[in-house]
Amino acid sequence: GTPVIRSGWEKMDALVAKGTGLVLMHYAVHPGIKEGEKYYTPWIGGYFKNGHSVNPFWRAKITPLKDHETARGVGKIDAVDEFYFNIQYHKNMIPLGSATPNEKNLHHINNLWSRAGYEAKGKSQALLWGIERPGGSRGAGFTGGHHHRNWAIDGYRQLILNTIVWTAGKEVPKGGVSTYTVTEDELNENLDDYGPKTNRVKLPTEADVTFSPGKWMTPQEHVEMRAKRIRKKK
C-alpha cells in the first residue's frame, strides 16, 4: 500500500465481516494490487489497479444510476477533478455514477497512464460504484475528491451523501438526503492549516469547467513527456 493506506487491513476486514458499511474516496481507493484483490474487491467492489487504472484530470458530467435510490434528488453534476477511471471492478459492481472520458473533456493527463487507460477513451466509466456483499451489507468507492471545491456542487454532494446512507443500510429519502447549498466559509472549515501557504478554497464556477482540451496521449508520448520534464528540472 501507500503511506496513506498501508495498514489496518485485518481490523477493517473484521468490521466488514460483521456487516459494517464502507465508503472509500479518491486516494483511499488506491491500495497495492495484493490488498486491492484481497480486501477492496469484496469490501467496496473495486480499486485503482496500478498499471491498469489511470488518474487524469477531466470534465465529467456524472449521470447517477437511473431508478436507484442513490439517485434520489440528485441534480446536475458537471465537475473537473482527478477522476480516476478504468478501475478494476468486482463482477457484481453497481455503477452508481458514470461519465465518459474523451478528447474533448480531457484537461490533462497526470502521472499514471497506461495502454488500458488510453484505450478507454469514449467508454462509460463508473466513477462512483457500489456492491451488495453476501449477507446484505454494502460498500462503495468514489474516484473524485481531489478538488475540495466540488463539494459545493449540489448534485455532486447529494449523490455522495445518498451513497453513504445507502451503504449504511438505510433507506435514502424520496427527495434524497437533506442537504443545503454550501457557502465559501463552510467550504474552508476544518481544513489543514499550512500557515502562509494555505490557499482559500473558492466556490466552483463555470470557469473551472471551461478550458482547451489537453492531448489524449499514447503511453509512449506520455513517457516522453515525463522524461522531458525531468530533464528540464536538472
What are these model-predicted stretches?
Residues 1-34, 142:
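Short alpha-beta junction capping motif
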Residues 3, 61, 151-155:
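Residue-level detector of secondary-structure boundary/capping sites
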Residues 7, 11, 39, 69, ...:
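Extracytoplasmic/secreted proteins, especially bacterial periplasmic and envelope-associated proteins
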Residues 10, 41-44, 59, 114, ...:
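Short linear interaction motif-like sites in intrinsically disordered regions of transcription factors
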Residues 14-16, 40, 140, 164:
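Short, flexible coil/turn micro-motifs enriched in small/turn-prone residues
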Residues 17-21, 45-48, 164-172:
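Hydrophobic/aromatic-lined pockets within catalytic cores
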Residues 24-109, 117, 176-233:
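An acidic, glycine-rich "communication" segment
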Residues 73-76, 80-172:
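A glycine-centered loop/beta-turn motif at secondary-structure junctions
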